[in-house]
């Protein structure tokens, strides 16, 4: 035995990829070796000139040990910084059974409602929490963060408002990170932001206004009068409200506002150096068709039973493109589920106890300071005590004393220091903080504390009265409720999810473990830089890896989603061109096949979209591109192009596309949705891209979470790097100091970056190259096998596809009347989530199997689609009626096959159509959901409790 051969640093790659299937897969596609296969699939013209510059792989154990060493360089102080981020306690039953459970975190956005009823109910619970606390009748299923939500509120106010003005008022008490993001958005919308005293907001003419409730320094103001005066003038009013304070305070709706927004992080979601967290967004009923993001609604299924679904999707970017209300796709579903379940578990009395405890501790601390002659700035506050020492030296001394005792305070200005209390604050903290503020060792506080909130500020209405918030307060009950919901959903712990353009690959357990380590989860985003050395090292490691993979000169990690990455990349181009004196460049070329986020993003940046034709092979029509680039050469800003194309093909003309745009004065933005087909084969920067967004939740193993979180960092060439997103409170070490932000936290959802770090570290140089090759091989295997039954719509070199393929169902539909939707729903009876339906071409399925699926799983999926083809043919031949067959009736529930049966097909054909289905049957919990009924009868709050009964 050779000892060296018994250590296996590549063990993880062998878990991520199915090396044992290689020969059979290659034989099926007519190749003898992987090198031959890649050579015959990928155009030589795009191949990268050198190998990836990445370290060799580490084992799972070694990678975890190395990451633990990095994490240990973060210093966990007790955080009293506030500014929208607070220590909290994640209930362990929720931590283990939701956050750490692949049944929840590996699911996709619930487009296929029949196999997503569990997380749809969880998101409906979240919406109900937001409805109860804000007082509005409608709330969304989360936005990316509070600052983004504020910017969306500003945009929505302009859409729905009647005041003919381009001016928007911002309360001077808003969080600085919120104002920073609003400045970015306002510039390209053409809005003028006016920041001022909240009490004087009605002295100008504004289309909208935003107030902070509670203020950034802790004060609670009665906003009712000023809101009333603004409303009398027709101004749309938004309130950014602390979610925990709303447990006690009057709701924004009662104050007279139109929109409420904020962060739900305090409801059991760790700070995580800035994210991810779910923002809430609630509003008046008349605004529902202008609202951004997802909304969960109650509808009914084909049998008339209540069923949940995503409602009003015609507002969204994939439908309305440049006319969409927002470019948001992925939001923060998993974090919204955590926050909603926090309210379910604690119930109304539990959250009131927590909110009152926070307020009582802050009040007791303020009382002690006042009795000691210290100037507490605000008499009325919820959780934050701001002190003015009158001189800088004393403020420095107190800040340093607290730091030495292990407490992070916030420095408000030269003479003021603030302490923000929170759920984990304890009585001993009062003693330590009192010592830091006064220099005295003893602190005696009374058990009976008088609060600092005036009676007229407190809410009188009841909250969280729905039975779901009053039933699951023991751990057994909560555990079983979570399991019941999980069992209604089909996630990747059950079967492959082959959604094209979504890259649903393995989210390995070793990758997920570190996100709940305290060294990552318990760090405030504005903690002193000396306390975040571990995060800085992690970011530097990842920047180096991503630069090697993509060929770019700089990386910005701030964007919180792919859509926000798009916005950030195009924003860098706009800023660069303005700095070059070319602000007139406002034309954006977008291929006809592009994802809807592309035109929506361009419109948000004030760009005019010019559509470029595609040819019969799905490629960009080079002649049309050249003509339009030359026509608009003096105004050409950029092209937004996806590579490989949205049609799943390597376009051989990509270098020509980039050259033509550059020759006509434009920049090249590459959409990185399909980056999984590039790593180790080509580099976007090397073929001519100037900026690229990367979906870490696709290519780099961050799970989709049932609709978020995501991360969309951007890679930039050197000339664009200074124009990446900056930040008002944190040095990003990339953007120039005067650049405003796109997200609330400087490094976006930093606490999920360890997932990608682990993936890169365990795969290493060779593993990352192999992953791309296997993604191509699996896709071509699926395409080859399915081509026997279905036309493959687009192929490239040698009849090959890239990492995904488009199956054309239109001929079958024409023959039989069976639709792509019928086939998608029928796949549920076989235990599979449908591929992407009718995108980028109506009447098709786009399939992306990814590299991490075994041949056995691919064969089951292929067998399902082949059997479905035979079922469709039966309908076409008249053996089954068009109005009564297993496709139009799909999916079938257990209730269907245990009740009366009058169908022309058997129960077995309905629910066990192939032998393998018996081994691992997934039962949809509802029949086909009625989308039209749901939109016409929109209900976005929790239905009566009897609907929850089994």
Curated annotation (Swiss-Prot):
The modification N6-(pyridoxal phosphate)lysine is found at residue 698. InterPro entries: GcvP, GDC-P_C, GDC-P_N, GDC_P, PyrdxlP-dep_Trfase, PyrdxlP-dep_Trfase_major, PyrdxlP-dep_Trfase_small. It comes from the Bacteria. It is an enzyme of class 1 (oxidoreductase). Its EC number is 1.4.4.2. Keywords: Oxidoreductase, Pyridoxal phosphate. Pfam families: GcvP2_C (PF21478), GDC-P (PF02347). It catalyses: N(6)-[(R)-lipoyl]-L-lysyl-[glycine-cleavage complex H protein] + glycine + H(+) = N(6)-[(R)-S(8)-aminomethyldihydrolipoyl]-L-lysyl-[glycine-cleavage complex H protein] + CO2. One of its GO terms (molecular function) is pyridoxal phosphate binding. GO terms for cellular component: cytosol; glycine cleavage complex. GO terms for biological process: glycine decarboxylation via glycine cleavage system. Its cofactor is pyridoxal 5'-phosphate. SUPFAM superfamilies: PLP-dependent transferases (SSF53383). The keyword Oxidoreductase applies. Belongs to the GcvP family. The glycine cleavage system is composed of four proteins: P, T, L and H. The glycine cleavage system catalyzes the degradation of glycine. The P protein binds the alpha-amino group of glycine through its pyridoxal phosphate cofactor; CO(2) is released and the remaining methylamine moiety is then transferred to the lipoamide cofactor of the H protein. This is Glycine dehydrogenase (decarboxylating). It comes from Neisseria meningitidis serogroup C (strain 053442).
């Amino acid at each position: 035995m050779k000892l060296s051969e018994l250590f296996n640093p590549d063990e993880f790659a062998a878990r991520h990829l199915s090396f044992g299937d290689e020969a059979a897969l290659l034989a099926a596609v007519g190749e003898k070796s992987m090198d031959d296969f890649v050579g015959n699939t990928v155009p030589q013209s795009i191949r990268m000139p050198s190998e990836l510059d990445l370290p060799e792989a580490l084992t799972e154990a070694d990678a975890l040990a190395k990451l633990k060493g990095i994490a240990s360089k973060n210093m966990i102080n007790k955080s009293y910084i506030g500014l929208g981020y607070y220590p909290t306690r994640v209930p362990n039953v929720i931590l283990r059974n939701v956050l750490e459970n692949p049944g929840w975190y590996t699911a996709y956005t619930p487009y296929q409602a029949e196999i997503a009823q569990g997380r749809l109910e969880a998101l409906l619970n979240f919406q109900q929490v937001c409805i109860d606390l804000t007082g509005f009748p409608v709330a969304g299923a989360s936005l990316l963060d509070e600052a983004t939500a504020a910017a969306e509120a500003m945009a929505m106010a302009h859409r729905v408002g009647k005041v003919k003005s381009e001016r928007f008022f911002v309360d001077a008490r808003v969080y600085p990170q919120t104002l920073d993001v609003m400045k970015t958005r306002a510039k390209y919308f053409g809005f003028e932001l006016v920041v001022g005293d909240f009490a004087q907001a009605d002295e100008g003419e504004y289309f909208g206004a935003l107030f902070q409730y509670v203020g950034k320094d802790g004060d609670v103001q009665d906003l009712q009068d000023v809101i009333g005066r603004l409303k009398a003038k027709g101004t749309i009013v938004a309130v950014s409200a602390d979610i925990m304070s709303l447990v006690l305070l009057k709701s924004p709706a009662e104050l007279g506002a139109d929109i409420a927004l904020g962060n739900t992080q305090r409801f059991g979601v760790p700070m995580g150096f800035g994210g991810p967290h779910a923002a809430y967004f609630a509003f008046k009923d008349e605004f529902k068709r202008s609202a951004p993001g997802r909304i969960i609604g109650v509808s009914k299924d084909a049998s008339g039973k209540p069923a949940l679904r995503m409602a009003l999707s015609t507002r969204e970017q994939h439908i309305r493109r440049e006319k969409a209300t927002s470019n948001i796709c992925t939001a923060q579903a998993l974090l919204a589920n955590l926050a909603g379940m926090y309210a379910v578990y604690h119930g109304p009395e539990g959250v009131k106890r927590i909110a009152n405890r926070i307020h009582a501790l802050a009040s007791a601390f303020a009382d002690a300071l006042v009795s000691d002659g210290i100037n507490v700035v605000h008499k009325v506050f919820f959780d934050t005590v701001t002190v003015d020492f009158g001189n800088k030296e004393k403020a420095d001394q107190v800040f340093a004393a607290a730091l030495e005792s292990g407490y992070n305070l916030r420095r408000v200005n030269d003479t003021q220091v603030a302490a923000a209390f929170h759920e984990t604050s304890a009585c001993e903290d009062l003693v330590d903080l009192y010592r830091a503020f006064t220099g005295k060792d003893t602190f005696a506080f009374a058990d009976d504390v008088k609060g600092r909130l005036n009676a007229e500020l407190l809410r009188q209405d009841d909250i969280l009265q729905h039975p779901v918030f009053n039933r699951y307060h023991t751990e057994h009950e909560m555990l079983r409720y979570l399991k019941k919901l999980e069992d209604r959903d089909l996630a990747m712990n059950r079967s492959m999810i082959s959604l094209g353009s979504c890259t649903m690959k393995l989210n390995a357990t070793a990758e997920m473990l570190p996100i709940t380590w305290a060294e990552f989860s318990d760090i405030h985003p504005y903690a002193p830089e000396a306390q975040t050395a571990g995060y800085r090292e992690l970011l530097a490691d990842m920047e180096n890896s991503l630069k090697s993979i993509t060929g770019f000169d700089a990386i910005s990690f701030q964007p919180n989603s792919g859509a926000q990455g798009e916005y950030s990349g195009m924003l860098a181009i706009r800023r660069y061109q303005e700095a070059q004196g070319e602000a007139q460049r406002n034309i954006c070329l977008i291929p006809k096949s592009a994802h809807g986020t592309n035109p929506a993003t361009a419109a948000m940046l004030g760009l005019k979209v010019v559509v470029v034709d595609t040819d019969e092979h799905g490629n960009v029509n080079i002649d049309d591109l050249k003509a339009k680039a030359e026509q608009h050469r003096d105004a050409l800003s950029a092209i937004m192009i996806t590579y490989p194309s949205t049609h799943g093909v390597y376009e051989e003309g990509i270098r020509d596309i980039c050259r033509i745009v550059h020759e006509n004065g434009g920049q090249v933005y590459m959409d990185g949705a399909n980056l999984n087909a590039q790593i180790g084969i080509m580099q976007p920067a090397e073929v001519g891209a100037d900026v690229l967004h990367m979906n870490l939740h696709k290519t780099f193993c961050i799970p989709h979470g049932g609709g978020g979180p995501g991360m969309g960092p951007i890679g930039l060439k050197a000339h664009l790097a200074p124009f990446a997103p900056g930040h008002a409170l944190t040095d990003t070490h990339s953007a120039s100091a005067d650049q405003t932000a796109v997200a609330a936290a400087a490094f976006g959802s930093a606490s999920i970056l360890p997932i990608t770090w682990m993936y890169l570290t365990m795969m290493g140089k060779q593993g990352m190259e192999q992953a791309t090759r296997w993604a191509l091989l699996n896709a071509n295997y699926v395409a080859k096998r399915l081509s026997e039954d279905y036309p493959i719509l687009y192929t490239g070199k040698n009849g090959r596809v890239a990492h995904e393929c488009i199956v054309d169902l239109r001929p079958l539909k024409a023959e039989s009347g069976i639709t792509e939707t019928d086939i998608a729903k029928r796949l549920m009876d076989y235990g599979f989530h449908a591929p992407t339906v009718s995108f980028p071409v109506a009447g098709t399925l786009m399939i992306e199997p990814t590299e991490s699926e075994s041949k056995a799983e691919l064969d089951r999926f292929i067998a399902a689609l082949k059997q479905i083809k035979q079922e469709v043919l039966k309908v076409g031949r008249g053996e089954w009626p068009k109005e009564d067959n297993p496709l139009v009736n799909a999916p079938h529930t257990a209730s269907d096959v245990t009740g009366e049966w009058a169908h022309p097909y058997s129960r077995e054909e309905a629910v066990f159509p192939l032998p393998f289905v018996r081994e691992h049957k997934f039962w949809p919990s509802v029949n086909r959901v009625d989308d039209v009924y749901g939109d016409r009868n929109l209900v976005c709050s929790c239905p009566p409790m009897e609907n929850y009964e089994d």
